[in-house]
Amino acid sequence: MVDSMEFFDREKEINYLVKVLSFEPNLIYFIYGPINSGKTTLIKHIIENKLDRDKYVVFYINLREHFISKYEDFIEVLFNTYEETFIEKLKKYLLSFINDLPKNIDVKSTILTGIPVPKNTLNEFLSTKNSENVFEYLTKIFEDIKKKGKQPILIIDELQKIGDLKINGFLIYELFNFFIDLTKEKHLCHVLCLSSDSLFIERVYNEGTLKDRCKYYLVDDFDYKTTKAFLKKHNFNDEEIDIVWHYFGGKPIKLVEAIQEKLLGEDVKEFCKKSLRVRKRQLKDLLYSLEDDNKELFERVIKLFENFKNRDEIFYEKISEEIVWTVKKNILFVNIEEGILKPQSKLDLLAIREILDEIKT
């Protein structure tokens, strides 16, 4: 049996991030990559298997699971409420922090999925909409943890979901300043921000307040060597491996799907070919809709796609309107540090090429 996103051989990434977490907090880390490249799986594996629970307290806030359209939504996701008496107990017995919060923790991972807060304090945060009060409270929690000899880690998954929220300006910029305070200024708490939205990461990359205060870490799809080892582990022969690599590259989620289909007795090549037909149909539907709405942009998108007829990736000078459209539709991916534009997956690359061939004929 194979898990929906089985963890496999990320030793380079694990070693790097574990080393980062062993240092004194000094920088915000933005962990990004193509969709379904395994970012969340990697981080959870590190937390659950590589960190000493006696040394670290991890707060993992997953915004992916929530609809967030206003400040109140974000605050309610950020915090878990408890009775005041429990919070007082928490302050007294912080060393038993993890054991005292059974409802708030994934037993296997010992990850806290929200910041503990008394109900009346949460109500105050919601009514006043004062982010400074929220940040002061969070700082106090992290300071208390640090005083007890533990290192707090704050992880926010899919941070881009609050990118456009406003409270006297964009909330995201207030958060960035808070993260700088936690890391660069106070060296209090590690901050890891995960995102599959490369346009959001590009926006962050060009944000002046973060210069020299953050680092970007790319978690990409598997290379051929890792892909081959992964499929070999699941009894794929060399021909099947080459077929899967041709259609899917090293996209972890597609490799898992191929393994599951093989276990179900399906033909691997037929599954791959069907996957390409489906993805091509999806892209054509998006393009037809764009052509109806904006003929000029459609033509620029097709011209952009033509760059991939003989190349897997290209360099870009600036983020144009056609790049924005393709990235928002999860067709292309922007590697901001290297200025590289490439399809989100090998399947997208093949679909683009087949569509271009059909347009020519």
From Swiss-Prot:
A Gene Ontology molecular function term for this protein is:
ATP hydrolysis activity
Alphabetic keyword roster: ATP-binding, Nucleotide-binding
Q: Which CDD domains match?
A: AAA
Q: Does the keyword Oxidoreductase apply?
A: no
Concerning Gene3D superfamilies, the annotation shows: P-loop containing nucleotide triphosphate hydrolases (3.40.50.300), Winged helix-like DNA-binding domain superfamily/Winged helix DNA-binding domain (1.10.10.10)
- Taxonomy, superkingdom: Archaea
User: Does the UniProt entry include the keyword Nucleotide-binding?
Assistant: yes
The portions of this protein that span the membrane are: none
Positions that bind ATP: 33-40
Q: Which SUPFAM superfamilies match?
A: P-loop containing nucleoside triphosphate hydrolases (SSF52540)
Q: Which InterPro entries match?
A: AAA+_ATPase, ATPase_dom, MJ1010-like_2nd, P-loop_NTPase, WH-like_DNA-bd_sf
Belongs to which family?
Belongs to the archaeal ATPase family.
Protein name as catalogued? Uncharacterized ATP-binding protein MJ1659
Give the species this sequence originates from.
Methanocaldococcus jannaschii (strain ATCC 43067 / DSM 2661 / JAL-1 / JCM 10045 / NBRC 100440) (Methanococcus jannaschii)
